[in-house]
């Protein structure tokens, strides 16, 4: 098992490099980089009207020099500005070097989690991520744990009661939850419980109260749960349907197999059959969906929830940075997302062996 883990960890290196290379290459062709933005602000032009004719950050090609022409012609709106000032802008934002050299500098710095400074916030990117990460982790972990805590028992019950009235009624509820996205549940919960039109029970903004630092530990826990209750409820209502149906179908497939009939013929109780024999086999496919559920909630699923409940998390930071073309923050977020995703997938694979010891990764190719 140790050899398998080491192989997987080593394979993460080219995967991360590939993700970084693709992300870096895409950024090179996105118009309206930081140099153009600085120029447009100096010229009093609207930021959205800026464009570039070549590489990222307002750079044509990969080098810092333009063949046969004045340097200011690289950037729309740069006419009238001192070429030396344009060079200083390029140096400030790191675009005075060839693209390939910038990429290897990026790889070197990211290997030590040195993400540089945000272009527009003037703070280290790592500090921004540390500040926003707890919010996204809280939403992702609570949503995933509660969603699976509801969907697994419900899916097992639906499989046992397949075709009954209970199965029919819960199927309607599951389909309803699947059809409506989480952010609509969030808006509904705000209207109902945050003083929109009915009750003022839960807070509308933030993850903690203003006087959080002055509270005792029990009060801090209650305050945190009070703030996070509705965002997590909205995420769970919009996400438990898939894992519920997956659990039900997986159990139905296993229940029909011969070993289940043999266990029943031996006189084992139904509970012993379900949780002593069927559960381990049926849960493999459910566990396989755990990384996707967590990553989805962690990165994309919580973006609109963060907007509705005014939670300053990593999802909103990524969106805002992409809109502002704050490339250090965008690339750092992609790097963190990819790294966490790969680690969670590895943990998911290792969980297979805990659920079913018959699985041996040592004898299989990665």
Task: Describe the function of each predicted region.
Residues 2-3, 134, 142, 146-166, ...:
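Alpha-helical transmembrane segments of integral membrane proteins
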Residues 26-29, 173-206, 234-236, 240:
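Membrane-water interface segments at the C-terminal ends of transmembrane alpha-helices
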Residues 12, 132, 136, 172-175, ...:
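Residue-level signal for discrete positions within transmembrane alpha-helices
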Residues 77-80, 84-152:
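An internal, D/E-rich "acidic patch" concept
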Residues 16-99, 197-220:
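Hydrophobic alpha-helical transmembrane segments of membrane transport/permease proteins
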Residues 6-12, 16:
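N-terminal signal-anchor/signal peptide hydrophobic helix marking the start
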Residues 1-3, 96-101, 112-126, 162, ...:
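Short, membrane-interfacial amphipathic segments enriched in basic
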């Amino acid at each position: 098992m140790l050899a398998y883990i080491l192989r997987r960890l080593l394979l993460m290196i080219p995967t991360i490099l590939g993700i970084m290379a693709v992300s870096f290459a895409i950024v090179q062709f996105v118009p309206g980089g930081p140099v153009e933005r600085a120029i447009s602000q100096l010229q009093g032009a609207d930021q959205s009207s800026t464009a570039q004719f070549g590489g990222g950050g307002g750079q044509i090609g990969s080098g810092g020099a333009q063949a046969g022409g004045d340097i200011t012609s690289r950037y729309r709106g740069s006419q009238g500005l001192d070429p030396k000032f344009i060079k200083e802008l390029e140096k400030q934002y790191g675009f005075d070097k060839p693209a390939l050299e910038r990429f290897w500098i990026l790889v070197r710095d990211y290997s030590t989690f040195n993400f540089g400074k945000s272009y527009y916030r003037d703070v280290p990117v790592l500090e921004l991520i540390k500040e926003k990460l707890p919010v996204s982790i809280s939403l992702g972990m609570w949503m995933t744990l509660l969603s699976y805590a509801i969907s697994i028992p419900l899916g097992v019950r639906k499989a046992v009661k397949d075709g009954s009235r209970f199965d029919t009624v819960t199927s309607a509820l599951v389909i309803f939850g699947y059809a409506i996205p989480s952010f609509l549940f969030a808006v509904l919960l705000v209207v109902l419980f945050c003083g929109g039109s009915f009750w003022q029970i839960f807070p509308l903004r933030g993850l903690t109260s203003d006087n959080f630092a002055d509270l005792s530990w029990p009060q801090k826990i209650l305050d945190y749960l009070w703030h996070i209750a509705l965002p997590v409820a909205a995420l769970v209502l919009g996400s438990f349907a898939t894992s519920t149906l997956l659990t039900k179908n997986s159990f139905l497939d296993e229940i029909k197999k011969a070993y289940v009939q043999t266990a029943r013929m031996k006189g084992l109780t139904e509970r012993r059959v379900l949780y002593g024999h069927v559960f381990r086999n049926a849960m493999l496919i459910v566990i396989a969906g755990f990384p996707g559920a967590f990553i989805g909630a962690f990165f994309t699923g919580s973006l609109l929830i963060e907007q509705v409940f005014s939670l300053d998390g990593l999802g909103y930071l990524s969106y805002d940075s992409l809109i502002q073309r704050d490339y250090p923050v965008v690339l750092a977020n992609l790097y963190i997302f990819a790294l966490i995703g790969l680690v969670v997938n590895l943990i998911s694979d290792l969980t297979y062996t805990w659920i079913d010891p018959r699985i041996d990764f040592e004898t299989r190719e990665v």
